[in-house]
């Protein structure tokens, strides 16, 4: 039986001057300005006056709040005066000034998730804890580097963090190496100049100033005279001039410093290698044994690869979601079937920009995001997002815009690679990503749903309830509480993008960690009782205790999905309650 319940009429909630929902929405819109107001406000306190610039920050935010809430009539009591607003903003602490105990607050406020690659710069207990404070939602292990022992250490540390922290959880992603073509080891980097001749050979162990080996036996067969060979996605480039049975002779087009084990691409071509190599299968087995949450599968060319991997996981009894990395020219014609077979996609722009004309990458990024959203799949934007912060403490303005564009286009998550794996400023990079995503989200109009989303789900009753719960959240300015054992309803709600946070309560630790990837979802572990009302009350008490909601705030409660929890009482249930 389907049931929709409200503690008071929806119309009353919209019109009541004491409902509090409008002021709550105003506060949420005001929060992103806290950094500017805090900095400027401190100057004002020292000088004994409020600066004109800080007034402008508040004025702009107030105008944004008015635009957002024009649909709902309000009385003067609903909107605090400017002095109260300024005082509240000055009292708010900027993220990073607080201790670990305050981590839940920025998590609730920021919807776009952050994937951080853990490497030599961050693979200690202290750094993983600090990355979590800085905003990391998913810890990624790049299997192209390191060994199983080093990755096991990171997995154990993340699991330790999850066990010790009640108000946050970090998911674990294992990124397969895939069929990469790489140059061999060099005793020291080789400096190459434009016009110079250079040779790549399939003979192992060659490393001279004019020739280096590659790790792929069919390399010679895959290239032809006139092909453009790119190193590390275009940091260096070579024109193929001729080839023999075991070597490829090139002319340096864009020079630079060639280091050991550099990634090689041929523009417009993909290597004729299987998408999942023998090493990948070893790494996948390692992931099963250590119960990771996600596989990011490199260089997926067709859906068959995904089906093969999922069959293996099913036979192994492993509940691990598969994220396909779109980074091969061969994957573009099969994009729809690949994403359909998967649980999500990663826009891996580095290799994608090497195999395709670079000007196509932003167009493909938007298309892949839109396709994933219309199909109800998670989508991650990756590669070079804050590349300059590997060596510099501040990002370029273009990088900041890049993050904002990904957030505005609707990505579930944005990813840091070398920035946190081996960069000099991993915590600052994560902090920049958090701040930019948070500020961008404050400017996005709620209620923008992807077209054809309903066609992606077979459970039409759950769809309907997710849609109406989203409408309720957007109309009343409320957050949403959902109870789930499988994560299905929380993921479905996430793709509808309600304006408020989705608090997903689950009694499964595995589901809690998985939901850490999805936009707008704050996963919380809680044991469910046999009584729905008691569980609802416990959930609201938890949110109140953690400071995630305020007393008197309205919350939409959803209980629906593929495996209803309290089947005897109601299969599908939406309520609006006051905390």
Swiss-Prot record:
Classification lineage: Eukaryota, Viridiplantae, Streptophyta, Embryophyta, Tracheophyta
Which PROSITE patterns is this protein grouped with?
PYRUVATE_KINASE
Q: How does it assemble?
A: Oligomer of alpha and beta subunits.
In the record, the note on similarity to other proteins reads: Belongs to the pyruvate kinase family.
Positions of the site: Transition state stabilizer? 325
Q: Which cofactor does it need?
A: Mg(2+); K(+)
Q: Which GO terms describe its biological process?
A: fatty acid biosynthetic process; lipid metabolic process; seed development; seed maturation
Which pathway is recorded for this entry? Carbohydrate degradation; glycolysis; pyruvate from D-glyceraldehyde 3-phosphate: step 5/5
Q: What is its EC number?
A: 2.7.1.40
Q: Where is the composition biased (Polar residues)?
A: 6-24
Q: What is this protein called?
A: Plastidial pyruvate kinase 2
**Keyword ATP-binding included in the entry's annotation:** yes
Q: Which residues bind Mg(2+)?
A: 327, 351
Q: Where is the transit peptide?
A: 1-63
Q: Where does ATP bind?
A: 142-145, 182
Function recorded in the entry: Required for plastidial pyruvate kinase activity. Involved in seed oil accumulation, embryo development and seed storage compounds mobilization upon germination.
Identify the residues that bind substrate.
140, 325, 350-351, 383
Q: List the effects observed when the gene is inactivated.
A: Reduced plastidial pyruvate kinase activity and altered seed oil content leading to wrinkled seeds, retarded embryo elongation and reduced seed germination.
Q: List the GO cellular component terms.
A: chloroplast; chloroplast stroma; mitochondrion
Q: How does activity depend on pH?
A: Optimum pH is 7.8-8.0.
List S-S links within the chain.
none
């Amino acid at each position: 039986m389907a049931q929709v319940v409200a503690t008071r009429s929806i119309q009353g909630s919209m019109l009541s001057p004491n409902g509090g929902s409008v002021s709550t929405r105003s506060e949420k819109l005001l929060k992103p300005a806290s950094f500017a107001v805090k900095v400027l406000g401190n100057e004002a306190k020292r000088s004994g006056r409020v600066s004109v610039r800080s007034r402008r920050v508040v004025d702009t935010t107030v105008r944004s709040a008015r635009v957002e809430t024009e649909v709902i009539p309000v009385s003067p009591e609903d909107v605090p005066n400017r002095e109260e607003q300024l005082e509240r903003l000055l009292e708010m602490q900027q993220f990073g000034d607080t201790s670990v105990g305050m981590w839940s607050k920025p998590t609730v406020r920021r919807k776009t998730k952050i994937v951080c690659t853990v490497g030599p710069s961050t693979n200690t207990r202290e750094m993983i804890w600090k990355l979590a404070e800085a905003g990391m939602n998913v810890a990624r292990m790049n299997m192209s580097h390191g060994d199983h022992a080093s990755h096991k250490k990171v997995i154990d540390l993340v699991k330790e963090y999850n066990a010790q922290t009640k108000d946050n959880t970090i998911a674990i992603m294992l990124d397969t190496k895939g069929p990469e073509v790489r140059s061999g080891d060099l005793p020291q980097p080789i400096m190459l100049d434009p016009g110079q001749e250079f040779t790549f050979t399939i003979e192992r162990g060659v490393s001279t100033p004019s020739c280096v080996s590659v790790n792929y036996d069919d390399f010679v067969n895959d290239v032809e005279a006139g092909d453009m060979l790119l190193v590390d996605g275009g940091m260096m480039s070579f024109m193929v001039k001729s080839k023999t049975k075991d070597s490829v002779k090139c002319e340096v087009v864009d020079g630079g410093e060639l280091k050991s084990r550099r990634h090689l691409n041929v523009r417009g071509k993909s290597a004729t290698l299987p998408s999942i190599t023998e090493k990948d299968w070893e790494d996948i087995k390692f992931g099963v044994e250590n119960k990771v949450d996600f596989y990011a599968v490199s260089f997926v060319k067709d859906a068959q690869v995904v089906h093969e991997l999922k069959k293996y996981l099913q036979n192994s009894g492993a509940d691990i979601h598969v994220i396909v990395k779109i980074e091969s020219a061969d994957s573009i014609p099969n994009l729809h079937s690949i994403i359909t077979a998967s649980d999500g996609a990663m826009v891996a722009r580095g290799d994608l920009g090497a195999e395709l004309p670079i000007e196509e990458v932003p167009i493909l990024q938007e298309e892949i995001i839109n396709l994933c959203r219309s199909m109800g799949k998670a989508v991650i934007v990756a590669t070079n997002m804050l590349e300059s912060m590997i060596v510099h403490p501040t990002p370029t303005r273009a990088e900041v815009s890049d993050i904002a564009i990904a957030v505005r286009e609707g990505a579930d998550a944005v990813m840091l690679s070398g920035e946190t794996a081996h960069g000099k400023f991993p915590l600052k990079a994560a902090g920049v990503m958090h701040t930019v995503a948070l500020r961008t989200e404050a400017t996005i109009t709620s209620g923008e749903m992807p077209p054809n989303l309903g066609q992606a789900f077979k459970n039409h009753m759950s769809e309907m309830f997710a849609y109406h719960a989203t409408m309720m959240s957007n109309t009343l300015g409320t957050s949403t509480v959902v109870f789930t054992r499988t994560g299905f309803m929380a993921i479905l709600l996430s793709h509808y993008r309600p304006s408020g946070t989705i608090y997903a309560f689950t009694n499964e630790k595995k589901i809690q960690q998985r939901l850490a990837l999805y936009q707008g979802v704050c996963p919380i572990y809680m044991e469910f009782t046999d009584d729905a009302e008691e569980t609802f009350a416990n959930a609201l008490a938890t949110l109140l205790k953690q400071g995630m909601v305020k007393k008197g705030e309205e919350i939409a409660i959803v209980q629906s999905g593929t495996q209803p929890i309290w089947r005897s009482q109601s299969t599908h249930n939406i309520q609006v309650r006051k905390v």
